[in-house]
Amino acid sequence: MSNRKYFGTDGIRGKVGESPITPDFVLKLGWAAGKVLARHGSRKIIIGKDTRISGYMLESALEAGLAAAGLSALFTGPMPTPAVAYLTRTFRAEAGIVISASHNPFYDNGIKFFSIDGTKLPDDVEEAIEAEMEKPLTCVESAELGKANRIVDAAGRYIEFCKGTFPSELSLNELKIVVDCANGATYHIAPSVLRELGATVITIGCEPDGMNINEECGATDVRLLQERVLAEGAHVGLAFDGDGDRLMMVDHLGNKVDGDQILYIIAREGLRQGQLKGGAVGTLMSNMGLQLALKDLGIPFVRAKVGDRYVLEAMQEKGWRIGAENSGHVILLDKTTTGDGIVAGLQVLTAMVRNHMSLHDLCSGMKLLPQILVNVRFSGEHNPLKSDEVEEVTRQVEKELGGRGRVLLRKSGTEPLIRVMVEGDAEESLIAEMANRIADAVKAAG
């Protein structure tokens, strides 16, 4: 990927009120995007958002910029990211824009774009938008200004789409499900989908106030979900992140089930049904246990760079249909075009119902190796990964693992963090000690 000024691995993101997430920047971004996208013909753009309080301000700024460029906006209101991708396709809009910072705290926000086919914008289009940003803002003639309208049935359209990915001959009548919507964009979608398919649904994280998104709930913190599943005697729990493109699950015993395990279940079920096309794509962070379990099933597996866009690129390159990150981004190209937490969850529930198996039993064919991830915040002025001390400690740990594990150090694409991952076939306490040793060296270098 080329060196761009504003766009990162997942759009543009930052703290609200600080560059680049300011009203004036976002207005200019809307205008620049409008100028570039108008060249392709369509004059309408879908705009969705999660439940952050800043979403109101930013969608107004975006709409003003688009209107000045002559494009009209169609607002969905709070809506999961994959719903915006879906609506962009069905409305034949030139693009979709999501205002969200995904799993980040409420005081962050971001902007990401989808193309007309519901996939993320190609690099060259993002680069063209950045180039347009450098030009002075102009306004089309009054008669050519864009308009703004609301898609009044956006939620209902997406609910029906999600239900359509669940087999019509099955139902969820026998399941009690706890769903945690992270006080985010799925709060009015996921419970309805599950109830309409017959499940008994208990909700948590479904009361957004603009500031409680992802706060001690959702896919990034499943402790509350684990407690509630056990307290309610539920069969399963589902947790989404703030914008609904990630999924974590909890089995009836309170165990967390991550993106690697979800990918394993979906791949194995696809194989059983004769519907698996090729293999499965994971990432550099995928647990080695996933690779070994898929190998036992004869399912090919490759690792992409971390980031759902890279998973998708690898899937397209291979012609494969399923891929996931262990963080819970699950992409199922036979169902949709981007990571979709609700759709992924429905495929796991399908496997449970069809095979009369618990989530715990579905996971039993895959043994997760101990994997410790430590996030180290740094100033951003120096790259700790280039430190001689960090390299030396990393070499020592790799030698101790003796070929029975992996060490991975990488910079986050969205935050000033170094992610330290150590994985191996050893006691978890030993793996944690190794990871903390490297993390301490990174802290000292940062």
UniProtKB/Swiss-Prot annotation:
Keywords: Isomerase, Magnesium, Metal-binding, Phosphoprotein. Mg(2+) binds at residues 102, 241, 243, 245. It catalyses: alpha-D-glucosamine 1-phosphate = D-glucosamine 6-phosphate. Its cofactor is Mg(2+). PROSITE patterns: PGM_PMM. Binds 1 Mg(2+) ion per subunit. The active site is at 102 (phosphoserine intermediate). The modification Phosphoserine is found at residue 102. GO terms for molecular function: magnesium ion binding; phosphoglucosamine mutase activity; phosphomannomutase activity. The keyword Acyltransferase does not apply. CDD domains: GlmM. GO terms for biological process: carbohydrate metabolic process; peptidoglycan biosynthetic process; UDP-N-acetylglucosamine biosynthetic process. Its EC number is 5.4.2.10. Activated by phosphorylation. Signal peptide: none annotated. GO terms for cellular component: cytosol. It comes from the Bacteria. The keyword Translocase does not apply. HAMAP family: GlmM_B. Belongs to the phosphohexose mutase family. Catalyzes the conversion of glucosamine-6-phosphate to glucosamine-1-phosphate. This is Phosphoglucosamine mutase. The gene is glmM.
